[in-house]
Amino acid sequence: MAISAQAVKELRERTGAGMMDCKRALEETAGDMEKAIDLLRERGVAKAAKKSGRIAAEGLTATAVAGNVAAVVEVNCETDFVGKNPEFQTLVKDIAEHVVSQRPASVEEALEQPFKGAGETLGHVINEKIATIGENISFRRFALSEKTDNGVFGAYLHMGGRIGVLVTLEGTQDETLARDLGMHAAASNPRFANREEVSADEIEREREVLKNQALAEGKPANIVEKMVEGRLSKFFEEYVLVEQPFVKDTDKKVAVLLKEAGATLKGFARFQVGEGIEKKQEDFAAEVMAQVNKQ
C-alpha cells in the first residue's frame, strides 16, 4: 500500500527514527501506526532515536582511499570506552569507505543512501549499532577529495584516530611527502591551505586588531603600518599550511618543500575528535559505572 508523507512524519515525531526507517516500518505493517512503533522498538531504532539526544563528544576519525578519491570522516560516541570498541572502530572505517564509494554531498544525504550502495541505509546501520552498543553514535562530518593520476593523497591518523588528516597533492606521487604533510597538519593545526583561502574580511579584521594593539602599545602612527604588516606575516605563518615551518625541518617552510618536489597543495582536511562540542564533565569512576550499568 502507498504510505503518505503525513504518516511518515507522524511516526518520525513519535519515535525520533529516521525517515526511511519510518517509511519501511509503515509499509511492513500496512500503515498501522501502533504496530509500526512496536516494530521500530523491536529493531532498536526507536531506542536509538532516544539516545540520539545525548552528547557524543568522544569517537574516532578514519580515512579511506579508492583510486583517485579519498575521504576523512569523524564519528562520535559518548565515551572513550566505546571509542576503543572494535565494533565501533569497524563502523567508523566502514563509514569512510561508504563516503568514498557513494560520494554524498552531505551527512544527511549519506545517511539516506544504501550502505555502500546496497541494502539498508547507512542511517539504519548506525541505528542498529546504537542499539547493540548502547550509546549514541553520531556521524558528524566528512571531507571528500579527488586527485588526478599525477597526484597523491596523504592520509594520517594521530593518537589512534583522535586526529585525522587528509592531504591532497598534485604534480607528485611521493607518498612519503604526502604523509609527512599529513603529520605536519596534525601537529601544527593550520586553518588554511594557502593565503588565497583566507577571506578579505578575515585579513581586514586581523589587520584592525593588530593596528589597535600597536597603537595601545604607544607606537608612533608612522611606524604602526609597518608593524601591522610584519605581524600579519606572522599570522599567515601560524595559520596557513604552506607558510608554516615544516615540523621535521623547521628551517624550511612547507612551500619550499613543495617547490623542491615540483608539487602543489590542492587542499587538506583536519578533523580532531570532539572539537567544538561541549562535553559533559564526568569523573572516571562515574564513566566506569555508567558502562557497568549498561551491561
From Swiss-Prot:
Record has Cytoplasm as a keyword: yes
Family of this protein: Belongs to the EF-Ts family.
Pfam families xrefs: EF_TS (PF00889)
Keyword set, alphabetical order: Cytoplasm, Elongation factor, Protein biosynthesis
Protein's gene: tsf
Primary location group: cytoplasm
InterPro entries documented for this protein: EF-Ts_dimer_sf (IPR036402), Transl_elong_EFTs/EF1B (IPR001816), Transl_elong_EFTs/EF1B_dimer (IPR014039), Transl_elong_Ts_CS (IPR018101), UBA-like_sf (IPR009060)
SUPFAM superfamilies associated with the record: Elongation factor Ts (EF-Ts), dimerisation domain, UBA-like
Region (Involved in Mg(2+) ion dislocation from EF-Tu): 79-82
Free-text function comment from the UniProt entry: Associates with the EF-Tu.GDP complex and induces the exchange of GDP to GTP. It remains bound to the aminoacyl-tRNA.EF-Tu.GTP complex up to the GTP hydrolysis stage on the ribosome.
Protein name: Elongation factor Ts
UniProt organism field: Brevibacillus brevis (strain 47 / JCM 6285 / NBRC 100599)
A GO term for molecular function: translation elongation factor activity
Cellular localisation: Cytoplasm
GO cellular component: cytoplasm
